[in-house]
Amino acid sequence: MQYSFTEKKRIRKSFAKRPIVHQVPFLLATQLESFSTFLQADTSSTQRKPEGLQAAFTSVFPIVSHNGFARLEFVSYMLSPPAFNIKECQQRGLTYCSALRAKVRLVLLDKESPSKPVVKEVKEQEVYMGEIPLMTPTGSFVINGTERVIVSQLHRSPGVFFEHDKGKTHSSGKLLFSARIIPYRGSWLDFEFDPKDVLYFRVDRRRKMPVTILLKAIGLTPEQILANFFVFDNFTLMPEGAQMEFVPERLRGEVARFDITDRDGNVIVQKDKRINAKHIRDLDNAKTKFISVPEDYLLGRVLAKNVVDGDTGEVIANANDEITETVLEKLRESKIKDIQTLYTNDLDQGPYISSTLRIDETADKMAARIAIYRMMRPGEPPTEEAVEALFNRLFYSEDAYDLSKVGRMKFNRRVGRDEIVGPMTLQDDDILATIKILVELRNGKGEVDDIDHLGNRRVRCVGELAENQFRAGLVRVERAVKERLGQAESENLMPHDLINSKPISSAIREFFGSSQLSQFMDQTNPLSEITHKRRVSALGPGGLTRERAGFEVRDVHPTHYGRVCPIETPEGPNIGLINSLALYAHLNEYGFLETPYRKVVDSKVTDQIDYLSAIEEGRYVIAQANAAVAEDGSLTDELVSSREAGETLMVTPDRIQYMDVAPSQIVSVAASLIPFLEHDDANRALMGSNMQRQAVPCLRPEKAVVGTGIERTVAVDSGTTVQAFRGGVVDYVDAGRMVIRVNDDEAAAGETGVDIYNLIKYTRSNQNTNINQRPIVKVGDIVSRGDVLADGASTDLGELALGQNMLVAFMPWNGYNFEDSILISEKVVADDRYTSIHIEELNVVARDTKLGPEEITRDISNLAEVQLGRLDESGIVYIGAEVEAGDVLVGKVTPKGETQLTPEEKLLRAIFGEKASDVKDTSLRVPSGMSGTVIDVQVFTREGIQRDKRAQQIIDDELKRYRLDLNDQLRIVEGDAFQRLARMLDGKVANGGPKKLAKGTKIEQAYLQDLDHYHWFDIRLADEEAAAQLEAIKDSIEQKRHQFDLAFEEKRKKLTQGDELPPGVLKMVKVYLAVKRRLQPGDKMAGRHGNKGVVSKIVPIEDMPYMADGRPADVVLNPLGVPSRMNVGQVLEVHLGWAAKGLGWRIGEMLQRQAKIAELREFLTKIYNESGRAEELDSFTDDEIVELAKNLREGVPFATPVFDGATEEEMSRALDLAFPDDIAKNLGMTPSKNQVRLYDGRTGEMFERTVTVGYMHYLKLHHLVDDKMHARSTGPYSLVTQQPLGGKAQFGGQRFGEMEVWALEAYGASYVLQEMLTVKSDDVTGRTKVYENLVKGDHVIDAGMPESFNVLVKEIRSLGIDIDLDRN
């Protein structure tokens, strides 16, 4: 096995029993692939597939004018590079996007041309079509400076669906069948039976009409309709009775209404006997062709065709008429011999279409279409053209109706056709086929569809959602262009005069900015980012709504297996509607979810991997990943547990066709991070996977000692870490930048082989957590492509590290862990284990008001010197200042209107001048409850406004930093190029050169070192190829210099141009505060198994329970939290974590006593290779073994993959290896080594029972008490009720509700109650009086009338009751 540079530093010991047969795919692939398909930016315009933007353009263009003499054709489109990079967009609050330009061609035809159209003029031009937001390399979008994610939508696939109402509609419980044809866009067509078995149709859920109206409208006559749905019985009328053609299976099961005889007159079936199989056989044997029937047998039957008198041409009876005695008489009079009737019975041939035809009053095709027109457009007079146009537009027009590729495929498959391609509009035979299947369902043949089957639900990804929006915008443009095309020739217009890009821009902007599926990215930690991008929602436009979604839609379905995670979904109203993709799931070309399986041939597992969708999967027998497999790949068990069509069964190996690729295949990323998931109850696992997403990144991330082996994949795929683009040697490292000198074989010829990585330092995430990258390589390290070079937030040596490993003891402690409370040692806080940094962004804007512009300044009256001391001369706080709540960050004054002055004020003005009173202080202050350090300030100034000193200084600093960066890059690039040159020139023969280099001399290193580097290029070489190479390197350096100069100029231009600010804003200042949050009582914490709680007390280290060797516990948890919750995984994690730490301590002890490398190797081999997946430690050098051992001192990380984890024996073996008997005795461990004797820290006495102790990875969640604690003295009041507002955001008060009032009443505290309900709430006059009294030093309350009483009076008056307050 190949280990990467980072993996070698710390190997995770895996207990997996199965080899890796299929790597976990790139976790963000769905988003990135979908959007790149939408843009097709890197494909040349001629080779673009009809997908995404290309499809939208080609579906709307060409646009033809109303008179047909002008048309606008689409040629191609191109995307220009974005004006600002991602970081600049985030800083300036811009959208990271690219301008879309389309090349269109205006073709004008000659109106005078008599016969065929002749092209008179062609104008081609590039037209601006708006801006398209671009996806960042990590799958998000930057919209107005914030990162957003477009969530994929799970919606009903287009196609045809058959269902019944489960007997809920009608009181009798009768099943009413219905069918629905759903197009991708266009009108829905529904067919439904009513309780009387009449078949109706409706368009777009409007009024229902008999289905035969639709059949007539598509051109069928009643005869054709009946011929399509029924088989006919043939009768020949005889002078006495009639003869019926004998069809055996039609008679079976019926009761004979007369004696049935054979040709010789022998009675085979007696009257009133049921006809059975033997009777049919006898009739067959007698070679019966016809049966004589009495005349009354015909009565009540229905004619299948119109009956016409052969002589006169008169219609005697119509198709679908019932045969009565009158009709029979007429038939005999007209000498009609042969008639056909419909064959129906009560079991499997109902008369439904015939009954429907009977209630249908329309006569012919036109009448039927008029009826449909009246239903669609009630009140409008139907003209023939309008009627035809509406009907054709409903289902037959490509503009208005699109079944889509998926819809056509699903439709054809459902109606049993072989080919899966066809027209995208509805055809007549499609409607007929649908009705036929529906009638067959009513007749008891076939099955209804399961709507929740993942073969009937498909995923719309970013690309598709964006394409739909773009098309909607284009269609709006098309309408406008059609209007103007008529004038194109007369006014000599160009294409850009015709096209207005506003509708497209607004459609795209609305979608990315405010659509339900465009969400503010959850950026708490790398896992929450990745999960958000892999989320699949059933809500959103065109999807379900929370209120209407029933239990079935939300429930886990057998087809979710390997496609959608059965565990991870939110608790609350969205449960089951928002899901997560499973680990290996993947979208196919139609948008259906697929999952990989290994092919099994003749009971042998092969290496072939096939992706199957839910529809295909139903046809195979699939074994689970944990089926026993021999060395040669054959299945060894006699019976293998497998799945077929959603059912679990035990089958013999020869029936198995596929096998799962991995046990973790069925769960999502978050669930696959929970060790021992198989031992947790599903409800708790759900909480565990949701809470991992809320873990706040700690100051020093620490890897989980017990993991599942997928941590590295998550960290790398999330994009939080920095990966090497190309391999090479680390040349330079500091906290903010790394430089790698690329390997010769990876650097393209003539190119400078240097990669420079600038790290993200202390940046604010969407959730105000801190994003910071730290290098994990040192100068001289050799790295290869894809290696992790720097850790990001919540990653440790390239692995996800959401929390900290805590020494946990399960025991009660003085009631402080009652009801899931958590007891924490002071040492945890002192060591900053759970300290996190949060970055708050505070904004202030200076606007242009009616009374004059607001000003950002240091010159503010009534401000203490302490406050002013933090501001620079521009009135903006210094970086590095430590600020508390209420401190001024940016000084700002606003002009205020002239007010009526009191005599005292006039006097003051006369003495002290005007300035102070005509402005009011509106400075930006630190909000209540917040304190921290200023880490960054940004000043944005509108174009044309003079920049202040601070803004100019920020620009200068930025340019200086950029110039240094470029100089460093150039130095490294040149150094690298000259190193390569020295290697190349060494020993080459020269034709001459500087310092009188003679022709034919061999160049030596000493000569080169004496020479100035730039003179090396003056050496003339004999070898032409080498000379060309020398020239190429010289050109490349010159080019790089030129490139850097251009880049610097570009940067300067960007920084010095004015900023785009909202209208009316002159200046904007953003101040970033870093807030340090230590762990404190009230913070929420959790493990990974749904074991959550709130910190109740932080206990001094000397009071914590401790072991025999004096080691105190970090966390004390309540043991009662485990049995009822059934999340036993946490207990197993604690045991394995204990073993992991113990092994680390033993390795640390070996390193301390400088044990021999051989001993170290032997011990590591025992750890890694005695069970589970073996590691190739022999391939490591001694230095690498020592480095590995050093990184293992704090615990050997274990991986216990989901559903394939460590067994009890393996855990016991690990514990025995970690704690030999002598060590175990010193620690006071029990003989089984899974519990420890603990001592009470306060009394020093041993606790009565042994306690389960070990290491658990514990997280601090983003529900911090600092963000929730809030107090108010005075603040804003509600406008109508005059009561204080509620909530921290409004700086509101505490609600004194109904039950609190009861409590005070119960105590008889009448004065307190009066105070609460009046002056502390909504008694306006009373409030001011209290203030006046306090100023006077008189602590008296004058309670008056609460404002809510007046509100009540007004409310009653608004109901028309005259009520007035008697104030006497």
Swiss-Prot record:
The lineage of its organism: Bacteria, Pseudomonadati, Pseudomonadota, Betaproteobacteria, Burkholderiales. This is DNA-directed RNA polymerase subunit beta. It comes from Paraburkholderia phytofirmans (strain DSM 17436 / LMG 22146 / PsJN) (Burkholderia phytofirmans). Keywords: DNA-directed RNA polymerase, Nucleotidyltransferase, Transcription, Transferase. It catalyses: RNA(n) + a ribonucleoside 5'-triphosphate = RNA(n+1) + diphosphate. Its EC number is 2.7.7.6. It comes from the Bacteria. One of its GO terms (molecular function) is DNA binding. The RNAP catalytic core consists of 2 alpha, 1 beta, 1 beta' and 1 omega subunit. When a sigma factor is associated with the core the holoenzyme is formed, which can initiate transcription.
